[in-house]
A protein has these predicted regions:
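Conserved ABC ATPase "signature" region
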Residues: 39-56, 165-166
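ABC-type ATPase nucleotide-binding domains, specifically the catalytic core motifs of the NBD
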Residues: 19-39, 52, 147
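P-loop NTP-binding/switch modules centered on Walker-like glycine-rich loops
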Residues: 87, 91, 95, 99-178
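Interfacial catalytic loop of ABC nucleotide-binding domains
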Residues: 2, 10, 42, 59-61, ...
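Short catalytic/signature loops enriched in Gly
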Residues: 148-260
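A short, proline-enriched helix->beta-strand linker immediately N-terminal to the Walker B motif
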Residues: 80-84
């Protein structure tokens, strides 16, 4: 368990308001048998320093910090145990855009310095592109497509992925792109549709004349293209290059980090 830690989405709800930072970060160390208070406090202070916070913050409470600082405390809590894998559950979605870039760049620096592996969960595809090496796109709890980040963003081969990428805002006002607006309501994950889970909202199926195979046969992930690119679509080859080119546009993520932590 020590080798796997998590950074929670909500920096306001994931920290116990009744506990000082020293105990919030040190709780995991205590659970793993680090009973010496001096050793534990030293590890806590080191963890705070690593994420860009002052060592003397250990006696403060969560309400004394900003959202960005609270998320740094959450990151320090995860790092204190020396994990190999860190699950990042939407770690910047609750933060202001100006703070998001700081936290993302911090996570990238920590990955490099401590040789970490991240499982990064996000709905922001611009952030995913900036942050990830490989990407898996899920729909109703199942993988729809996965692959190298550059390959998948350049040549998506699942209709759902194409629709998601079409929704990324384009910062260039001179460039026009077509957005694929999905029809219908999202089905319940507890009672997903038969066959392909996306068939009730799939623009490609409608374009192909609503083939019955999408309803009766669940598609399995299969190789398509290079770099371990796989997709779960019976008609992935029909996702034409013209459609992909007209909808795929990526948005640059703020990469400048302010010197002082938020």
């Amino acid at each position: 368990r020590r080798r796997m830690q998590i950074i929670c989405q909500d920096p306001f709800g994931s920290l116990n308001p009744r506990m000082p930072v020293r105990d919030i970060i040190g709780e995991g160390l205590l659970a793993l048998g680090v009973t010496d208070r001096k050793i534990r406090d030293k590890r806590v202070e080191d963890s705070l320093e690593i994420v860009g916070l002052r060592r003397d913050y250990t006696r403060r409470y969560p309400h004394e910090f900003s959202g960005g600082q609270r998320q740094r405390i959450g990151i320090a809590r995860a790092l204190a145990l020396g994990p190999d894998l860190v699950v990042c559950d939407e770690p910047v979605s609750a933060l202001d855009v100006s703070i998001q870039s700081q936290v993302l760049n911090l996570l990238l620096d920590l990955r490099r310095d401590f040789n970490l592996t991240y499982l990064f969960i996000s709905h922001n595809l611009s952030v995913v592109q900036y942050f990830s090496d490989r990407v898996g796109v899920m729909y109703l709890g199942k993988l729809a497509e996965e692959g190298d980040v550059e390959q998948l963003y350049r040549d998506p081969r699942h209709p759902y992925t194409v629709a998601l990428l079409s929704a990324i805002p384009n910062a260039d006002p001179r460039r026009r792109k077509k957005r694929l607006v999905l029809k219908g309501d999202v089905p319940s994950p507890a009672a997903p549709p038969s066959g392909c889970r996306f068939h009730t909202r799939c623009w490609l199926r409608e374009k192909l004349g609503n083939p019955e195979r999408c309803v009766t046969e669940e598609p399995m992930l299969r190789p398509i293209g290079e770099g371990g690119h796989r997709t779960a679509c019976h008609f992935a080859e029909e996702v034409s290059d013209t459609v992909v080119d007209s909808v795929v546009a990526t948005q640059s993520v703020l990469e400048t980090a302010v010197a002082e932590p938020a």
